């Protein structure tokens, strides 16, 4: 889980390995989730204390620097003691959706500082997310590794939904659930292939063979 410490001015990464190794890196999961999703203007800064109460952080949403944290997850996985290679790491990256906003040249060329505020935030988030997706695709492709990384990112402009984070109306929640179901339907073959490969890597046999042995 990525988050940003505004008091110390640094990116923080929470993971299980650190929690097991060091008591001052052990935090309650609910508090880590609260901190890593504390989006400015939507939620207040989260004050997070570790289990020993000896260290604290003042945290905001990790999306401020890692809107798509897939590469962060990859790097954290590389820290395991057995030093995994890309061939040992499988990543299913799930995006929350993009509106695919564009800004025509004729209008944007006349914008001033105030008019650019919202577009800059939108571009920063979407471009950063796309960059991570591109980098991971190239990383796996250059290693000649197939079917171990893929990303699902719905284009919300194709659906009747609101992308606003604070729109929690029943209608919008149901619409977003429908988008999720549609994405599963569209990517079902890839999801099956991915989960099957993951299963084989962990169990050592095909899922149907495992259940026959049971």
Located regions from the model:
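Conserved catalytic cores and adjacent C-terminal regulatory segments
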Residues: 1-214
